[in-house]
From Swiss-Prot:
Family assignment from sequence similarity: Belongs to the universal ribosomal protein uS17 family.
GO BP of this protein: translation
KW tRNA-binding (keyword) present: no
Keywords for the protein's UniProt record, in alphabetical order: Ribonucleoprotein, Ribosomal protein, RNA-binding, rRNA-binding
Organism this protein belongs to: Halobacterium salinarum (strain ATCC 700922 / JCM 11081 / NRC-1)
The organism's place on the tree of life at top rank: Archaea
Assembly, per entry: Part of the 30S ribosomal subunit.
General function of this protein: One of the primary rRNA binding proteins, it binds specifically to the 5'-end of 16S ribosomal RNA.
Entry-linked NCBIfam families: PRK08572.1, uS17_arch
Protein name as it appears in the record: Small ribosomal subunit protein uS17
Length: 109
């Protein structure tokens, strides 16, 4: 509860300035959940979310996806396929405005 969200704190420690638990980064706004699609960048993961959009012409639903780059603090051990929660924060770079706050399934914190 140290960051104002109802998430479990990671067991590991880190010296990352942009960690909401061990650094000085504040979180605000939306909390999203998705699956990690890529961990190829340093300290960054790409979180993919799938959702359905109704198409009135065909009276059916179509699958869409969004890919959100998020900062991955050193205290989390994140791999591809993990389900994570990400929280909105100040812009950390040109594309990153979210940070991983919890691994909800598939990994160890």
């Amino acid at each position: 509860m140290a960051i104002g969200l109802n998430v479990t704190e990671p067991e590991g420690t880190c010296s990352d300035e942009d960690c909401p638990f061990h650094g000085n980064l504040s979180v605000r706004g939306q909390v999203l959940e998705g699956e990690v699609a890529s961990t190829d960048m340093e300290k960054t993961v790409v979180v993919e979310r799938e959702y359905d959009v109704f198409v009135p012409k065909y009276d059916r639903y179509m699958k869409r996806r969004s890919r959100v780059p998020a900062h991955a603090p050193e205290c989390f051990d994140i791999s591809v396929g993990d389900t994570v929660s990400i929280a909105e924060t100040r812009p950390l770079s040109k594309t990153k405005s979210h940070v991983v706050v919890e691994i909800t399934d598939g990994g160890d914190a």
